[in-house]
């Protein structure tokens, strides 16, 4: 019986790309992993290093360096290429440089005949995901950004430390921009199935000091707290990429907060922003529309308006 070989390409083998590749190899997410970088020798070195670690895993992944031409048969192309923000910059400040890089990258990939799924981590990821959708001409369900997947994970981690509950028992999402203007849909955050707002109301003596706005800010600024200490972040986002790729190949139907192009969902059109979505073998099967409160709707709309203002600077 013929079995389809799962193939992934990673474009950009810096710290994020190499961390993603390491996660993919260790988890055995695909059978072939192609690495592409403007510095080809770096991609070759990363491929060699990853190949040498495979004997210490329970997987067998073929890792090699190549070019855009090799993307033709890839199922997923992950793009991590792009400039890192400098001290004092926001992710949005890197837009101009990132957009120029995407024009070259997407053009090269599509010329190969690629017809799979794009998975983006390059910042500002929401706007870059929208740009890649426009440049590629692929259906909107097959162009996905990491969005607020990592932010939602950070939110659960912060809450778990405050509530002393395993983060995997906490469910909830950050929505909107993967950046400073993101918001949390508190009306849908649960701990063991119980609404967190109800828990805080019933247990004021234990949790009366918890400030929800402070948690939102702490979640949004978590990346910068890491940046101040070690210069950049890569493990979290690398694993987020691997997690989404795994969900695609396994057809898991997992709900993950990703950058998705909206066409009427949440009353929004022609914008890419962080929302929960069901991820399948075909990409985004469905965007999950949460019933937001009036205040949450306002915060979500404000975040999207900020994204729109920046989109205009690159012609969208």
UniProtKB/Swiss-Prot annotation:
One of its GO terms (molecular function) is L-lactate dehydrogenase activity. Pathway: Fermentation; pyruvate fermentation to lactate; (S)-lactate from pyruvate: step 1/1. Beta-D-fructose 1,6-bisphosphate binds at residues 156, 171. Its EC number is 1.1.1.27. NCBIfam families: L-LDH-NAD, PRK00066.1, PRK06223.1. The keyword Signal does not apply. NAD(+) binds at residues 16, 37, 42, 68, 104, 121-123, 146. InterPro entries: L-lactate/malate_DH, L-lactate_DH, L-lactate_DH_AS, Lactate/malate_DH_C, Lactate/malate_DH_N, Lactate_DH/Glyco_Ohase_4_C, NAD(P)-bd_dom_sf. Allosterically activated by fructose 1,6-bisphosphate (FBP). Belongs to the LDH/MDH superfamily. LDH family. Keywords: Allosteric enzyme, Cytoplasm, NAD, Oxidoreductase. It catalyses: (S)-lactate + NAD(+) = pyruvate + NADH + H(+). This is L-lactate dehydrogenase 3. One of its GO terms (biological process) is lactate metabolic process. It is found in: Cytoplasm.
